[in-house]
């Protein structure tokens, strides 16, 4: 079974279109009005070893909040749909990723209980058109809509760019590992995820 999804989410504020194939490493095309966010999405999807297209239009361009949140929601829904009943997936993963002085831990469980616990000390208030307060919000919206329990903790570092990028790399690597097929079982004592 192909593990991919095409999701379109349109509101009065944004229009988001996501195509995601979690089993085929290929081209990644990202188009949002937030340059640094584009960089982080490319990073996330590259480390997931995926093929993806993300197109985001901001109908009310007040600030970056709606784009960040709505892309997170739509990408989360795409991962959830692509995983189907989650049969055979490894389910759990953790990664500790350095980027120069920054060190970030990501631990996740594809549990169908979406929640995020994010502990990052982001010293800059904005980077590349992105308000850094929206980084934890991205992870929370993504986790809730993908059904992933997600923990992200900064272990060291002071450069905001490095801390954020290490977080997206670690999340991508953890998602790649947790979504790998390891057998034909549902990895849960309940028999469902």
From Swiss-Prot:
Under SUPFAM superfamilies, the record lists: Ribosomal protein S5 domain 2-like
Enzyme's top EC category: lyase
Identify the InterPro entries for this entry: IGPD_sf, ImidazoleglycerolP_deHydtase, ImidazoleglycerP_deHydtase_CS, Ribosomal_Su5_D2-typ_SF
Identify the EC number(s). 4.2.1.19
Which N-terminal stretch is annotated as signal sequence? none
What NCBIfam families does the entry give?
PRK00951.2-4, PRK13598.1
Pfam families documented for this protein: IGPD
Report the protein name in the record: Imidazoleglycerol-phosphate dehydratase
- Where does it reside? Cytoplasm
Family, per the entry? Answer: Belongs to the imidazoleglycerol-phosphate dehydratase family.
| Record's keyword terms, sorted | Amino-acid biosynthesis, Cytoplasm, Histidine biosynthesis, Lyase
Q: What Gene3D superfamilies does this protein's entry cite? A: Imidazole glycerol phosphate dehydratase, domain 1
Which reaction(s) are listed as its catalytic activity? D-erythro-1-(imidazol-4-yl)glycerol 3-phosphate = 3-(imidazol-4-yl)-2-oxopropyl phosphate + H2O
Quote the PROSITE patterns the UniProt record gives: IGP_DEHYDRATASE_1 (PS00954), IGP_DEHYDRATASE_2 (PS00955)
Q: Does the keyword Methyltransferase apply?
A: no
Pathway involvement of the protein, from the record: Amino-acid biosynthesis; L-histidine biosynthesis; L-histidine from 5-phospho-alpha-D-ribose 1-diphosphate: step 6/9
Its Gene Ontology biological processes? L-histidine biosynthetic process
Q: Give GO MF terms, alphabetically.
A: imidazoleglycerol-phosphate dehydratase activity
Any one GO CC term of the record: cytoplasm
